[in-house]
Amino acid sequence: FINLEEDKLHTEVPKILGSCKDGVIVPHPGPFTFTATRVPVSDGHTASITLGLEKTPDLDQVKELIEGYRGRAQELSLPQALEQPLVYRPEIDRPQPLLDRDRDNKMAVSIGRVRPADAFENGMGIIAVGHNHGRGTYGNAVLITELLVKEGLVG
């Protein structure tokens, strides 16, 4: 159990998936559900994600989208930005925190077990693993700083 972690997810994920209008974050309406658990792994977060989509997903296309994803950090060639921040793992037993969390200097997120999900009409499930410090707190702080400098928002 991680005290307040699930509450934090219910607050933060809709903001992350939302939009910005007139300088104000408009949270995505969801629906969302989260469970946070503590496991005996020193580093690495695992997310089991199930989505309901507007139409039946083409899983091969989803895999291509994962492999081809490039964000603003890649567009601007920020110094600490990976060329490929998301890595698709085709193995049936991957990703796993102990095996995948340190990928690409702890900055990559490994995604696998892309599959249909019956929980929703047009459902899809994935498993994602990232390093909670390298890709999380420390790595994101560095990327955000690089972005602010590159965009001329700080000197």
What is each PLM-predicted segment?
Residues 1-123:
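C-terminal substrate-binding/catalytic lobe of Rossmann-fold NAD(P)-dependent oxidoreductases
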Residues 103-155:
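NAD(P)-dependent Rossmann-like dehydrogenase/reductase catalytic/cofactor-binding core
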